[in-house]
Amino acid sequence: MKDLLDIMRKKTDSDGHTPIEFDRIRIGLASPEMIKSWSHGEVKKPETINYRTFKPERDGLFCAKIFGPVKDYECLCGKYKRMKYKGVICEKCGVEVTTAKVRRERMGHIELASPVAHIWFLKSLPSRIGLLLDMTLRDIERVLYFESYVVTDPGMTPLEKYQLLTDEEYFNALEEHGDEFSAKMGAEAVQDLLKDIDLEAEISRLREEIPQTTSETKLKKASKRLKLMEAFKESNNKPEWMVMNVLPVLPPDLRPLVPLEGGRFATSDLNDLYRRVINRNNRLKRLLDLAAPDIIVRNEKRMLQESVDALLDNGRRGRAITGSNKRPLKSLADMIKGKQGRFRQNLLGKRVDYSGRSVITVGPTLRLHQCGLPKKMALELFKPFIFAKLQASGQATTIKAAKKMVERETPEVWDVLANVIRQHPVMLNRAPTLHRLGLQAFEPILIEGKAIRLHPLVCAAFNADFDGDQMAVHVPLTLEAQLEARALMMSTNNILSPANGEPIIVPSQDVVLGLYYITRDAVNAKGEGMMFADTHEVNRALATGQVAIHARVKVRVHQTVINEDGQREKQTIVVDTTPGRCLLWEVVPEGLSFEMINLEMTKKNISKLINSCYRKLGLKDTVIFADQLMYLGFRQATRSGVSVGMEDMVIPPQKQAIIDKAETEVREIEEQFEQGFVTAGERYNKVVDIWARTNDQVAKAMMDNLSFTNVKNKQGQDEKQKSFNSIYMMSDSGARGSAAQIRQLAGMRGLMAKPDGSIIETPIKANFREGLTVLQYFISTHGARKGLADTALKTANSGYLTRRLVDVAQDLVITEPDCGTMGGLVMTPFIQGGDVIEPLRDRVLGRVTAEDVRRASDNEIVLPRGTLIDEKIAAQLEEAGVDEVKVRSVIACESTFGVCAKCYGRDLARGHQVNPGESVGVMAAQSIGEPGTQLTMRTFHVGGAASRTSAANSVQVRNKGTVRFHNVKTVQHAKGHLVSVSRSGEIGIADELGRERERYKLPYGASILIKDGEAVEAGGIVATWDPHTHPLVTEVAGKARFSQIADGVTATSKTDDATGMTTVEILPVTARPASGKDLRPAIVLDTTDGGEQFYFLPQNTIVTVRDGETIGVGDVLGRVPQETSRTRDITGGLPRVADLFEARKPKEHAILAEVSGIVSFGKETKGKNRLVITPDDGSEIYEELIPKWRTINVFEGEHVNRGETISDGPQNPHDILRLKGEVALTNYIVNEVQDVYRLQGVKINDKHIEVIVRQMLRKVDITDGGDTSFIKGEQVDYIRVVQENQAVLAQNKFPAKFERQLMGITKASLSTDSFISAASFQETTRVLTEAAVTGKEDDLRGLKENVVVGRLIPAGTGLAYHLERRRQEAEAAEFELHNDFSEVDQAFSQALNQEQF
C-alpha cells in the first residue's frame, strides 16, 4: 500500500510540476517586494474585455499578457497556435503560449500612488497598528482619513511625537517653528511612524517597565504590546508592511466575467471593487503629476484608501459599497468567511462525483449487508467500470462503442453491470449525518423501480423512516476505498453504537410487537399442559391447530451452553414454555441458553439478547440472528392481527371518584387562601401538586385496569393474567407509545403548560377518547405549537452545538498505547434517591483500572491495576461487593498529543481495547451532539402535557439496611429527634455487604427520625420536611429578641380574623419605605450562657415566634416560601448542555467559601453585606461583598470548609475547578450533562463527556513564571507548562506556578494552535489577522487542517501514512507503529466470506 502511495506521489501533472511536499504552513505579512515577485505584470487600466471582440483589453483587469492566454496554447492575436510553440512569447501581442489554466494562478499588481493602510490590521480588534504605535484607533483613523496631522519628528520643538494637530494648529506651528519639525497626514504618516519603531529597544523598555507597574490596566496594555512586538521580532515581519504600497491582483479566472444572452455580462463583485481602486489610483497619479491643490489630492488619497478598504473587507468601516442592485459587494474577506466562504463551502465540504440520490422504501427481504439499488441508478453510477469491462471482454472495441451500447441498454450491458456490482460495496448516506453511522456501506442488489431499498434494522442508525426520506449513494472507486468500506463501514460491522456500546441493530416497532406477541403466555389456552418431545413436534401441533401459540406447555429442548473456560457443552432439558417461544428458539444460534428467550420478548429483552449474542458468539452469528429475528417478527406481527380500536382505550371506572376527591381538596385550599392562611404562591403550588398527584392516580388506575384481565383457568377459578389489549401490548413490548401517551388517550390529559413554561393550574380532566371541550382544546394548542416551534429552533441549535464540539475535539486521536499515568477518576454507583440509576458495573465497564481494586471486607486484591474491565470482570466486582473503583480517564492522560489507549479503555463500537489512530474526539462530539438533535425533534411527543411530579416531603427507605450520613450536621431537638442544619447533607442506605443502595438529599431544616449507623426496615420513614417552605432553624437555645423588625418599615403583620393569630412577614427591600432600605431585620437569641446569636431574616420570611419567646434548640424561627417549579423538558436541556460545555457562569450562582475558617460579618455597604472568613491556618483574612438579597446560609461564628456553599444557587464550574480541582469539575460536568440526557432516556458513555472536558482544560494561566520563559498572566497549554517545568526542575531551578483554566468549547476551538482549524471555525478575519501578524506556523496535527490542505487525516488508516512521513524525515519520531497488513488482509478475506451465509 505504501508503494501505491509512493507511485501516487511521484506522479507529475501536465506541466511537469511535482506536487510540493510540506510539513507545516506559515502565514505572515507580505512585503512590497514579495507582492511584486508574485506578480506577472502591473494592471494599469480599469477595462476588462472589449465588448465587441470579447478579447481582454491590454493592461486591463483581464489582460492576457499579464495573466496568460484565454485559449489553450494560442496567443491572443492568433499568430502562434498549438503545442509546438509551447513557451514562446508572441512579439505582436506579448502573450506567452501555454495552457489557459495559468489564468487561475498568475497574479498581477497595482502600484499605489500613495500608501494605503490594510484595514484588517487597523480595524480588526484589538487594532494591531494602534497597539504598536500606542495610539487610540480614533486618532489613527483621523490621521488616515485626512482629518488631522500627526507629528512624525518633533525636532527641537516643544511638540511631541505622535501628537495630533488640526489644520489650524499645524499652520500655527509652521509659522512658529518653520521646518524644524515634520508632521504628515494619511497612510504615509502612519507608515513613517511604523518604520521609526525600534523593536529591540521598545521590547527591553517594556520588559523593565512591566514589573514596576501597579495599575492593572497599564499592566495589561504593556504586556499586550510586549507580546505583539516580540511576535513581530520573531516572525521577521516588519511593522511598516501593515501599510501597503503595492496591491496584489487576484488571477482573473478566480473573479470571472461571464457573457449572458442579450449581450450583458455577469461579473464577480471583485472586478467592480478592483475597477474602483484602479480608477482612483490613476486619477491620483494624474493629479500628482499636475501638482493639483493639496485639498483635492488629499480627498483623492482618502477615496483611494476607502476603495482599497472596500476591496479587502467591504463594510468593515462605514457603509458598505453597494452594487447596482443595492446589495453590498462581496469583498475578499467575505469570500473566505462564513458558511458560504472558501473554508466551509469548498475546503471542508466538497461535493463528490459518482453519487446519486433517491427516495427510500422498505426492503424487508434484504439481508443486513445488502441494499436495493435501482438499475437505472446503478447503470449511471458504475458507467466507467462498465465501459472498461465491455472493452476488456471484447464486446466493444472502443470506449465510444461501449458508450453507445450503454445508452441503448443492450442485454449484455445488464450482464456486465451485474458482474461489476458483485463484491463492489456502495455507501448510503442520509442527511443530516449526525454521527458516523449516518454513512454505511452495503452490497447493492439490482432492483426494478426507482427507489432505493433499505434494510429495516439499519433505520435506527440512519434515523430514517419511509415517509418520503431521501438517501444518497456514493461509489468507493479505488481498491483501498472499497477495502475500507468493506472492512470498516459495512453495516454488518457496525452493530454497536459508538455512543454507549449497546447494539444499535435492534428490532423496533412491528418486529418487536411480533416477537412479543408470540412469546406471551395465556391462561387456559388450547392445548395447555401438553408435553412435546422436541420443537419439531410443537411446529406440527401448531400447524394442525392442536395447540394455541400462547398455551403453557412442556417441551424437551437441546441447547449448547458455553461454560466458564469457553468450552461448548450440549444439554437436554425439559422446560415450561409456550409454542411461540419454541418458534423463536428455532432461530436462536447455538451457544445461547433457552432461559434467555423463555420470557416475554420486550424491546429491552431483545436488546439484551442481541448484546449477549454479540459478546458470546461474535459478529457473524449476531448478524445472521438479527436478520432471522426480523423476518420472524414481521411474519408474526402480521399474523397476530394486533391493531388499534376505539374500544381498546379503556377508561378506568374509578376516574370520576378520583377527580371528585381532588376537586374537594382544591376547594379547601382556595378557602384557606381566601382566609389568608396561605400565600398566592403557596396556593398555586399546592393546587398544581394536587392535580399532578391526581393525574398519576388516574394513570395508575388506568394502567392497572388495562394491563390485567380476569380469566377462568382450567380448574374454573378466576385468575389474573396480563391483558391482550392491543394498545397495552404495543406499549408494554416497547414497540410504540408510552404510558404517558396512553394516559392521555384513556386517563386524563392532565396539566398543560403555557407558552412561557408555567403550568396552568386547571388541568384537562378529559381524555382523547371522551373528547375535549373548546376551552380544553384551546389550552392544548399551546403545548402543540410550542412543540413544533421548539423543534425548528432546536434542530439548528443542536447542529451548532455538534459543530462546536467537533471543532474543539477534532484533534484528539489515540496516539500511544500507554502514557503511564497513575491518575484517574474514582467511580461509584450513581444513586439518586431510592434508585441506583447507574450501577457500578455499568460505569466501569470498558475502563482500565488505575490502581489495584481491593475487596472491602478483607482488603484482598480482586483486580490488579491496568486491567481492562469487561462484562465478566464487572459482574465479579459486583459479587465481591466492591463499592468504588479508581479507573483511568482521558482527563488524567499525560500524552503530549492526543490520548493513550489505556486511559481511553474500550472502543465502544467494537467492544475491545481501542486501536491507535482511532479518532476519539470526533466520536465523542458526535455521540453527544447526535441525541441532542434527535431529542429536540422529539420534544412534542407528549403533546406539551406538563410532566411534573408532586414535591417530595420525606425520605422513605426502599431496602432494608443501615443508615449512613454524608456531611450532615445536626442539632438535637427538645422532642428527641435530630434536625439537619447542613445544606449539602445526604443520607445513604447501605446493604449488608456495605454497598450503598440508596442516597437522598437532605434539605436544611429536615427532621431526622433516626441516628447515624442505625438499622432501618424497608418502607421506614427516615426524615420529613415541608417541601413548600424553607425554615430557619436555631442551633442554640435562648430568648428571642426582635431587631430592626418594625411594622410598616421592614415588616408587615397580618392578623387572622378566624383564629386571632398574628404573623409577621418581612418585606422585600424594594417594597420598603426609604427609612427601611438599609435596615437588616434579625432575631437575636440571648443564649442561656449569656452570649447572643444573630439570625438575619431574608425577604419574605414569615416569622413564627413572638418577641421575647423562649426558644429551644432545633426550633423554627421563620419560614421562607419556595418559588414555583418550571417543567423539565430537553428544551431546557439543550441550552443547559450548551451552557455546561461553554462553561458559562450561571446567573446568581452559588457563592463558595474561598478558604476554610470562621465566618463573621463586617461593616456593610449600601446594597451589600460584607462576609469575612478568618482562616484556620492564620493566613490573611478573606473578605467578600455579597448582595443583600442573597440568602446567606452561614451564621456568625460558624466554621466553613474551602469550597463549601455560602449562598445557594446554581454551581459555577469555574469555582469548582478553582476550589475543588479538576476531578470534582469533571464529575460535576459529567453528571450534569448526563442528567439532561438521562431525563430523555438517552444513554451516553461518560468517556465522551470526559474527552470534551479534557479539551476544555487545555490551557492554564501562569500565576508566577519562576525560571521558565513564561510571563505572569500568560495563557499556555497545560502540557507545555508541565514539560517546561520538568525541564526546569531537572536543573534545580524554580518551576512556573499556574492555575488550570476552564474554557468554553467555542473559545477553546479558537485558541487552538492551528490557525487553519480556528479560521475555518468562526471569526475567520480575527484569527487570520492575528496569525499573520505573529507569523504563526501550523504543524498540521489535527484532522481539520489536513482536510483543508487536501491530505489524508492523521487518524484511522491515514495515521500510518503520516507516521511514515514523519519517520522518513528521520526526526526520530516519538514512537513507531509497525503496520501489520496481515490484519487488513484477514479483515478483507473475512469480508469476502460474508457472502457464504
Curated annotation (Swiss-Prot):
SMART domains: RPOLA_N. Mg(2+) binds at residues 465, 467, 469. One of its GO terms (biological process) is DNA-templated transcription. Zn(2+) 2 binds at residues 819, 893, 900, 903. Its EC number is 2.7.7.6. InterPro entries: DNA-dir_RpoC_beta_prime, DNA-dir_RpoC_beta_prime_bact, RNA_pol_asu, RNA_pol_N, RNA_pol_Rpb1_1, RNA_pol_Rpb1_3, RNA_pol_Rpb1_3_sf, RNA_pol_Rpb1_4. The gene is rpoC. Zn(2+) 1 binds at residues 75, 77, 90, 93. The RNAP catalytic core consists of 2 alpha, 1 beta, 1 beta' and 1 omega subunit. When a sigma factor is associated with the core the holoenzyme is formed, which can initiate transcription. Keywords: DNA-directed RNA polymerase, Magnesium, Metal-binding, Nucleotidyltransferase, Transcription, Transferase, Zinc. CDD domains: RNAP_beta'_C, RNAP_beta'_N. PANTHER family: DNA-DIRECTED RNA POLYMERASE, DNA-DIRECTED RNA POLYMERASE SUBUNIT BETA. The keyword Magnesium applies. One of its GO terms (molecular function) is magnesium ion binding. This is DNA-directed RNA polymerase subunit beta'. DNA-dependent RNA polymerase catalyzes the transcription of DNA into RNA using the four ribonucleoside triphosphates as substrates. Its cofactor is Mg(2+); Zn(2+). NCBIfam families: rpoC_TIGR. Belongs to the RNA polymerase beta' chain family. It catalyses: RNA(n) + a ribonucleoside 5'-triphosphate = RNA(n+1) + diphosphate. The keyword Amino-acid biosynthesis does not apply. GO terms for cellular component: DNA-directed RNA polymerase complex. Binds 1 Mg(2+) ion per subunit. Binds 2 Zn(2+) ions per subunit.
